[in-house]
Amino acid sequence: MLVQQEPDASSFPNGGIRNTFEARGYSAWDPTSPAFIVGGTLCIPTVFIAYTGEALDYKVPLLRSISAVNKAATEVCRYFDKEVNRVIQYLGWEQEYFLVDESLWAVRPDLMLTGRTLMGHESAKNQQLEDHYFGAIPTRVIAFMADLEYECLKLGIPVKTRHNEVAPNQFELAPVYEECNLANDHNQLLMTIMDKIARRHNFRVLLHEKPFKGINGSGKHNNWSLGTDTGVNLLSPGTVSYTHLTLPTIRL
């Protein structure tokens, strides 16, 4: 039952590309991403595909791209090292976000409904503040961050850094890099946890890419790299003579 299920997929906006009898979708266990427990519920990472094989989620295209890059890059790497059997894609994401006091959030219908401001006036000082970026983190925010990091580590998300970002009340969290598929799953899980922990501390977290006009938005930088199963970083020039050719070859 865990390996494959057949839920209804007829309500997805697929533009009528399937006949009614083909409206079913298939969920399948993704064994490359570990299962985890939240609130007493076992959560199993899955993919979701149509009867005819089209992707009905974002994980399937990601896994297909990982497979394609692995196949192409491994063939290239074996010109330099016959011991290479697999090329791994690594990802280190950076999660930027804004924290807003819940009482202030509650009087802004635009924030409540859309997660961003749709009206208002710019403040007298925005990013001109010189004491915010990488400055001392407020005590209340530190308490939120510590609680968030504890919950993340319980779920295996290897969070590592935290700091003030450029805009007022903007912050950032980043983990140790992981394999691409797992890193993506962990980021999706993190955003869910952030919302829950923020409410616990009487905050609301804004994850919209541009919640306020006139100041920095919240980017999500993706630090992507390639490495072989023999431990070679393909985006590093290396110290051995033949590895000097690997980087320009991979880039080409």
Spans of features found by a protein language model:
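Well-ordered mid-protein domain cores that form the structural environment of catalytic cofactors
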Residues: 173, 184, 189-192
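Core alpha/beta catalytic barrel or barrel-like domain that forms the active/cofactor pocket
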Residues: 39-49, 83-100, 112-135, 154-177, ...
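Alpha-helix N-cap/helix-initiation motif
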Residues: 58, 62, 86, 137, ...
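ATP/Mg2+-dependent ligation/transfer catalytic cores
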Residues: 1-146
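Generic, well-ordered alpha-helical scaffold segments in large soluble proteins
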Residues: 72-80, 144-158, 190-201
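Secondary-structure capping and boundary motifs in well-ordered enzyme cores
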Residues: 65, 140, 165-166, 182-186, ...
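Conserved small/polar residues in nucleotide/adenosyl-binding loops
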Residues: 243-249
